[in-house]
UniProtKB/Swiss-Prot annotation:
UniProt region (Disordered), positions on chain: 184-206
Domain Pentraxin (PTX): 220-416
Domain of life (superkingdom): Eukaryota
Cofactor binding: number and manner: Binds 2 calcium ions per subunit.
UniProt keyword annotations, A-Z: Calcium, Disulfide bond, Glycoprotein, Metal-binding, Signal
Residues binding Ca(2+) 2, per UniProt: 354, 364
Name of the protein: Pentraxin fusion protein
Amino acid sequence: MKSLLLFLKSQVFGLTVETLNGERNGDFEQQKENHGAKNVAPQGIPYQSSYYGQKEQAKRVIDGSLASNYMEGDCCHTEKQMHPWWQLDMKSKMRVHSVAITNRGDCCRERINGAEIRIGNSKKEGGLNSTRCGVVFKMNYEETLSFNCKELEGRYVTVTIPDRIEYLTLCEVQVFADPLEVDGTEASDSSESVDGTEAPASPESDVELPIASGMNVDLTNKSFMFPKESDINHVKLLPEKAMSLKAFTLCMKVLLNVPENRETILFSYRTMFYDELNLWIERDGRIGLYMSGDGIIFPRMKFKSEWNHLCLTWESKYGRTEFWLNGRRSATKVYHQKNTVRSGGIVLLGQDQDSYGGDFDKTQSFVGQIKDLKMWNKVLPLRSLKSLFKGREIGNGNIFDWSSLSYSMIGNVAEV
């Protein structure tokens, strides 16, 4: 699946921490007066990960206009792809006070949800691993939001939609920044060498780089191995379709290497503010399911010291929820009747997300191996579940399927 990244207009403004705390929309000329920095975006060079139309679109984001109709040529637009991005080369290192972005006004306001603004000194992969300035939770049509970057330093400003296939559309980006000075002179650019090749970027202490990733990879007869307790190691899964769910079946095989009396996360799906679908082994060995609030607990079942095959089913209409382990049903419960699992989140194996995509606790991390993960946006019939437990082929999962999985591995995770 491919995603489109749609940029309207982006502007970067510099503000002191005292004058802007977090995101804000309003009078940007007043912001400029507060922090004294000017919008440097129009003097920069824009790039983007792909082009839905002409390459000149990238420049529309820094033309100084807050017009927001893509059909009238006001915005830039990427193809639908995994983590699309738009990047501004400010030509030298700058101290960035704030960045403001303007959303599209004629269509598709929700596409920008979850976008991240990043500042750094590397243009590699669009600066996706640079330091994060802010996250767009939600924007209205034509809305302009400003994000306090707290004087982050770097040459490149990136707007990206991470961890999902999407279009990126921006109508204006404004960057309020001051040139960096070293011993009274402006700092020279060190991100490129004299022959034009990119120099190594300085490491960001709070960023863990992917060690491997793939799109629609066949992992048949392979597994993800999490060798030890960690607050880093995890795998991000990229769904084949939006996870707006009124029913699901989630199945996987796990080989555990954890002591008794330890909480262990099996599957974590979180949107910006909520745990949408978290599956746990509780401290007492029972199974816990948590979907946006209070959870339910299934009776303890004996996990084998070898591979264990588990399945979880849920449907919204009646709230019928079941957990299966190695072909045996633990219990049937009524849970979250009439509710919906919301889309736009991050799916992780190996870690529980206490915040959107982060705040991991190594004492809850998964240790062992996971394989044969499949997920459907429906409850499979009993016959299909029994066939699955017997190792028979029942067709591919339409959200996740082990024979065509899109993912990225972070930290010390091995594909074996």
